[in-house]
């Protein structure tokens, strides 16, 4: 068990070692001989493994072919290709660790690794809670209260929401509001003894409820931001974005304009570590300008295209680095995250830490940088691999009951559910 804890904590750490490789990636890759047995028969894992290998190989080969026309950063090529290979390896670590500790404790260990990784932000960032510490603490707190009464979960979610409210973090606050609304709804449904014949129908019913809760939460956060509740900076940004002709979403994410313009200009992508040429930079700026954003402010040159192509979208970052296989991998990741939440809604007992991590993954697949994703992927994809089929959701109780100690080795019945769906 101690080995499992150490591996899981290390997987949650993204601190760079030599040659710009992260602790998490190195540990995940090195531990494959130990962890492979936990996932070798899991069907949900197979497609993830194949696409990760294909995307990594494509990124490396395209990078080599691009050397005649582009400047290629060797360190960026190495980091990108190995980070793609490390995705299924990190998932294997989580599954292997969860077989021994339970999924909740495995998520807690990864969250603790994320917390250790974010500690330097206390000295380097003006808002460390928003940019790393808050997410790690949220994973840990929600893991700790996952087997507690709903009232305890509601209090924890309210406290976390209050901290994010004063930390100028709109998206995370919206996620917590969605989870809070879901927990309250399930508490009321359980109190009213609401019964749906099958887990599939229950999941569909709760997805509809969740959609309503999500819309209300997002509208509420936008209104709070515009009113100044989230701070003056958030208020100014929201008002400016809402008044733009491109709308709130596109104004808040002008990189989407750059991504679409680059995709139209070069649909097969670039390759890992490739630095854009002047013409690529010009195309990206034109796409951002079309959304009413002024790209002549140094941000595009210094941050988006300073060392490699970074489009603030995991999907488009991996399309640029690994072409179509990279894009398909990210779409698979988003699909697995959504499927994990759907299966969890097959009962009236949502898993808060899974919802928070899955919502974060889905957001960053589409409108967040790839660099944010690796720490969350073991939690979300590992849970997706471990979950039984939706039709068996009604048989589940609370995850990791204290009276049910974790098994040292997975039984055939524990592996079978992941193979059947």
Where are these regions (language model features)?
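Transmembrane alpha-helices of multi-pass inner-membrane enzymes
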Residues: 139-142, 333, 352-408
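Loop-to-helix entry and N-terminal half of a specific, functionally important transmembrane alpha helix
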Residues: 3-7, 305-313, 317-321, 328-366
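Aromatic-anchored transmembrane helix interface
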Residues: 19-35, 46-64, 68-95, 107-112, ...
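Membrane-interface segments at transmembrane-helix junctions in multi-pass inner-membrane proteins
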Residues: 71-90, 106-150, 160-176, 314-318
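Hydrophobic alpha-helical segments of polytopic membrane proteins
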Residues: 2-5, 141-227, 345
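Interfacial juxtamembrane loops and adjacent helix segments
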Residues: 241-245, 274-314
């Amino acid at each position: 068990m101690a080995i499992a804890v150490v591996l899981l904590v290390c997987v949650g750490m993204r601190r760079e070692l030599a040659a710009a490789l992260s602790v998490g990636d190195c540990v995940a890759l090195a531990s494959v001989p130990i962890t492979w047995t936990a996932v070798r028969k899991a069907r949900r894992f197979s497609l993830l493994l194949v696409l990760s290998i294909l995307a990594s190989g494509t990124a490396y080969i395209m990078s080599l072919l691009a050397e005649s026309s582009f400047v290629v950063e060797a360190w960026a090529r190495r980091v990108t290709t190995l980070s793609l290979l490390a995705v299924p390896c990190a998932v294997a670590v989580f599954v292997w660790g969860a077989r021994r500790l339970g999924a909740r404790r495995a998520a807690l260990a990864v969250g603790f690794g994320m917390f250790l990784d974010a500690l330097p932000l206390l000295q380097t960032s003006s808002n460390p809670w928003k940019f790393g510490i808050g997410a790690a603490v949220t994973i840990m707190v929600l893991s700790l209260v996952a087997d507690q009464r709903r009232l305890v979960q509601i209090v924890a979610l309210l406290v976390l929401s209050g901290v994010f409210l004063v930390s100028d973090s709109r998206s995370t606050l919206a996620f917590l509001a969605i989870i809070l609304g879901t927990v309250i709804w399930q508490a009321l449904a359980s109190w009213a003894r609401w019964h749906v014949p099958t887990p599939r129908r229950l999941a569909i019913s709760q997805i509809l409820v969740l959609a309503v809760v999500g819309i209300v939460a997002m509208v509420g956060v936008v209104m709070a931001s515009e009113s100044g509740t989230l701070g003056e900076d958030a208020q100014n940004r929201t008002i400016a974005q809402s008044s733009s002709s491109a709308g709130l979403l596109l104004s808040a994410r002008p990189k989407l304009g750059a991504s679409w313009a680059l995709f139209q200009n070069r649909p097969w992508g670039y390759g890992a570590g490739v630095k854009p040429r002047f013409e690529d930079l010009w195309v990206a700026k034109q796409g951002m300008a079309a959304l009413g954003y002024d790209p002549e402010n140094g941000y595009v040159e210094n941050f988006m295209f300073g060392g490699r192509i970074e489009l603030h979208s995991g999907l488009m970052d991996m399309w640029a680095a690994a072409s179509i296989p990279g894009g398909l991998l990210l779409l698979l990741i988003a699909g697995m995250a959504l499927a994990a939440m759907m299966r969890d809604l097959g009962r009236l007992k949502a898993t808060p830490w899974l919802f928070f991590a899955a919502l974060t993954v889905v957001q960053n697949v589409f409108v967040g940088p790839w660099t944010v994703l690796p720490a969350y992927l073991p939690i979300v994809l590992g849970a997706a691999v471990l979950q039984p089929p939706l039709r068996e959701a009604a048989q589940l109780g609370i995850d990791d009951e204290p009276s049910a100690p974790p098994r040292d080795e997975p039984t055939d019945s524990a592996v079978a559910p992941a193979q059947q769906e």
